[in-house]
């Protein structure tokens, strides 16, 4: 008991306008005060600490749930993206195959068109050569005919007499008359 009264007496000796601080001497502090302070801290701190821990626990659980939901959404999106990628790869393969076959088809079409053009040019060349040959043959024939006609006329003129002329004219008139009768 003496300690209790000594502590009250010592309170009177403390300066009121002095500094505030912790008394680190455990023997000089009042155990009752310490137990009251600790009891109050435990009583009120327990609820606050429990609320803090519950709030933290709820935040952790909600974060875990959110991350699980986000993971599920990410997995779904990944599967959709993989499906789209497979589809695009299939389409790309089809385009590639179709493109190669289209290129091959166009190549053969071009080769065939080139052969057809060459064949047409060859035919045109042959027709042109044939035409030029026919023209040359016709020119030669005309010259030969003209020369033969001139030779025949020259021979006729040199050997002709008036009686021969009269017979030729009569024969020609007879032929013209016969032709006229046929046409009428």
UniProtKB/Swiss-Prot annotation:
Quaternary structure (record): F-type ATPases have 2 components, F(1) - the catalytic core - and F(0) - the membrane proton channel. F(1) has five subunits: alpha(3), beta(3), gamma(1), delta(1), epsilon(1). F(0) has four main subunits: a(1), b(1), b'(1) and c(10-14). The alpha and beta chains form an alternating ring which encloses part of the gamma chain. F(1) is attached to F(0) by a central stalk formed by the gamma and epsilon chains, while a peripheral stalk is formed by the delta, b and b' chains.
Give additional notes from the record. Answer: In plastids the F-type ATPase is also known as CF(1)CF(0).
Give the location in the cell: Plastid, Chloroplast thylakoid membrane
Sections of the chain in a coiled coil: none
- Give the GO cellular component terms, alphabetically: chloroplast thylakoid membrane; proton-transporting ATP synthase complex
Q: Please give, as recorded in its UniProt entry, the membrane topology of this protein.
A: Single-pass membrane protein
Q: Per its record, how is this protein called by name?
A: ATP synthase subunit b, chloroplastic
**Summary of the function given for this chain in its UniProt record:** F(1)F(0) ATP synthase produces ATP from ADP in the presence of a proton or sodium gradient. F-type ATPases consist of two structural domains, F(1) containing the extramembraneous catalytic core and F(0) containing the membrane proton channel, linked together by a central stalk and a peripheral stalk. During catalysis, ATP synthesis in the catalytic domain of F(1) is coupled via a rotary mechanism of the central stalk subunits to proton translocation.
Tell me the protein family, please. Answer: Belongs to the ATPase B chain family.
Q: Name one GO molecular function term.
A: proton-transporting ATP synthase activity, rotational mechanism
- Please state the gene responsible for encoding this protein: atpF
- Specify the superkingdom: Eukaryota
From the broadest rank down, the organism's phylogenetic lineage runs: Eukaryota, Viridiplantae, Streptophyta, Embryophyta, Tracheophyta
Q: Show the stretches that span the lipid bilayer.
A: 26-48
Keywords tagged on the record: ATP synthesis, CF(0), Chloroplast, Hydrogen ion transport, Ion transport, Membrane, Plastid, Thylakoid, Transmembrane, Transmembrane helix, Transport
